[in-house]
């Protein structure tokens, strides 16, 4: 399979160049300054403190590997359903080309509930960090496979200066070593290889021994059943980012409750 991640990053750079023309930095700064902030990390910790799993529930219409996941896709309704059934936070895909996402979907989902929202996209430039704040995100994703360490550190610092939390995502030990140089407590382990899209939840289980106790491990991708959840919880993982299993269900929030509560 061709390297999907490299294709996505190339497209992102084209999108940034175009966006700078249509929405200059100064304009974005004004929009960003008008946004309120919700405590993403705090919402996860509150769930843990109450003895519950902390679920980052994803609003995702499609993916490159699975195609369209949900034909009847109304972000506001999905967000409300998640909030009513115990989600800690939302994750909303804003990538248009590969995931059929949209900044508009993030705005709609956030307006429909009180949950903090992660902008799920492939961030490679500070412009996208500011853009995330301007569209109303409370957190961003930084993917170690897509960024060198100095840039990742700079993007995190900029995000924190804007009041954004950072979820740093890794898939292997070498990426984890670099990710642990960041200040964020949130370390996501993606069970899906972004270069091949192969998925196994053993990826998370095999890396837990290398993560300090002061970090919050977020297991991402491939959590499809109650059995998967129980396996993770038995290993000490209590924070989950789940999309596909919910999106394929008739009622996403009810599926969340069935799997986790």
UniProtKB/Swiss-Prot annotation:
Belongs to the TrpC family. It catalyses: 1-(2-carboxyphenylamino)-1-deoxy-D-ribulose 5-phosphate + H(+) = (1S,2R)-1-C-(indol-3-yl)glycerol 3-phosphate + CO2 + H2O. Its EC number is 4.1.1.48. The gene is trpC. InterPro entries: Aldolase_TIM, Indole-3-glycerol_P_synth, Indole-3-glycerol_P_synth_dom, Indole-3-GlycerolPSynthase_CS, RibuloseP-bd_barrel. Keywords: Amino-acid biosynthesis, Aromatic amino acid biosynthesis, Decarboxylase, Lyase, Tryptophan biosynthesis. This is Indole-3-glycerol phosphate synthase. Pfam families: IGPS (PF00218). The keyword Amino-acid biosynthesis applies. The keyword Kinase does not apply. Pathway: Amino-acid biosynthesis; L-tryptophan biosynthesis; L-tryptophan from chorismate: step 4/5. Signal peptide: none annotated. Disulfide bonds: none annotated. One of its GO terms (molecular function) is indole-3-glycerol-phosphate synthase activity. GO terms for biological process: L-tryptophan biosynthetic process.
